[in-house]
Amino acid sequence: MNMKNNNLVSSYARALFHVSGSRLGIIRKEVEFLLAFFKDQDVFVYLSHPMVSLLHKKEAILSIKENLSENLVKFIMVTLANKRSRLLILILEKFLNLVRESENELEITIKSAEILKKPDIKIITESLNFLGKIIKVSHVVDPSILGGFVVRYGFNVIDASLKSYLDRLVDLSKMEMLKIRNCI
């Protein structure tokens, strides 16, 4: 996604977040419903197709209106009218990220050199509870980290891998070697 689209997605998602106000929990459930609906049906392809008229797109949304609050329907109509329908899934996903962030919920990815057992994953996630409520844990195996683990959440990384430890040792050794050379 280019920078312009990224800015548009963020702007629309923030607008929906602010409009939701005290109904944030309800809108969140409706957005989750919509995302599941769009991903399981050809509806999104229809809504984002440039040859489909705005009127037909609006009719498609109005057909599921009974499952959505008035504010969300209006938001989608504005999105369609502004010809941003191809960004709708990204906007709704970004909105959910904003909601999770506001409620201090985290999705984490744990990278390890080997497959971790459930008790190991539980220990890691329990030690990270201070960060917020962990709602989803993904596990990735990457033998290149040699040992330990790397945790990613949002834009943050906790690197407790053997590879990073060894890399730091190499860097420290190089610095000490330079100090010794400069002193001689």
UniProtKB/Swiss-Prot annotation:
Coiled coil: none annotated. The keyword Membrane applies. SUPFAM superfamilies: N-terminal domain of the delta subunit of the F1F0-ATP synthase. It is a peripheral membrane protein. GO terms for cellular component: plasma membrane; proton-transporting ATP synthase complex. One of its GO terms (molecular function) is proton-transporting ATP synthase activity, rotational mechanism. It holds the Pfam family OSCP. The keyword Transport applies. It is found in: Cell membrane. Keywords: ATP synthesis, Cell membrane, CF(1), Hydrogen ion transport, Ion transport, Membrane, Transport. Belongs to the ATPase delta chain family. F(1)F(0) ATP synthase produces ATP from ADP in the presence of a proton or sodium gradient. F-type ATPases consist of two structural domains, F(1) containing the extramembraneous catalytic core and F(0) containing the membrane proton channel, linked together by a central stalk and a peripheral stalk. During catalysis, ATP synthesis in the catalytic domain of F(1) is coupled via a rotary mechanism of the central stalk subunits to proton translocation. HAMAP family: ATP_synth_delta_bact. F-type ATPases have 2 components, F(1) - the catalytic core - and F(0) - the membrane proton channel. F(1) has five subunits: alpha(3), beta(3), gamma(1), delta(1), epsilon(1). F(0) has three main subunits: a(1), b(2) and c(10-14). The alpha and beta chains form an alternating ring which encloses part of the gamma chain. F(1) is attached to F(0) by a central stalk formed by the gamma and epsilon chains, while a peripheral stalk is formed by the delta and b chains. This is ATP synthase subunit delta. It comes from Wolbachia pipientis subsp. Culex pipiens (strain wPip).
